[in-house]
C-alpha cells in the first residue's frame, strides 16, 4: 500500500520543477500529486484553494 502526498513546488524554472517532479515520482511507497507554481502571486492563490502536505519553495521566488 502506498501513501498519498500532495506536494506543491514553488519554483520559477520549469526545468527545476520538472527535475523535482521526476525525482519525487520515483520515491517508492508514495503516490505523489504535484502542484506546480511559477510565481509568488500564484503561490498565494494556490495556498488559498489547496492544502498541500508539503511545500517546496525557492526562497527567491519572484
Regions found by a protein language model. Name each.
Residues 14-35:
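Two-component/phosphorelay signaling modules centered on CheY-like receiver
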Residues 57-60:
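Active-site residues of response regulator receiver
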Residues 37-54:
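Acidic, metal-coordinating helix/loop segments flanking the phosphotransfer/catalytic sites
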Residues 6, 33, 51-53:
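Structural signature of beta-strand start/N-cap positions in the alpha/beta core
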Residues 1-6, 16:
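Non-catalytic signal-transmission and effector/linker regions of two-component phosphorelay proteins
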Residues 11:
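Conserved acidic carboxylate
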Amino acid at each position: 500500500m502506498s501513501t498519498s502526498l500532495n506536494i506543491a513546488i514553488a519554483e520559477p524554472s520549469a526545468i527545476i520543477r520538472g527535475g523535482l517532479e521526476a525525482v519525487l515520482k520515483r520515491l517508492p511507497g508514495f503516490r505523489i500529486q504535484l502542484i506546480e507554481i511559477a510565481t509568488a502571486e500564484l503561490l498565494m492563490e494556490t495556498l488559498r484553494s489547496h492544502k498541500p502536505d508539503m511545500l517546496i519553495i525557492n526562497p527567491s521566488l519572484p
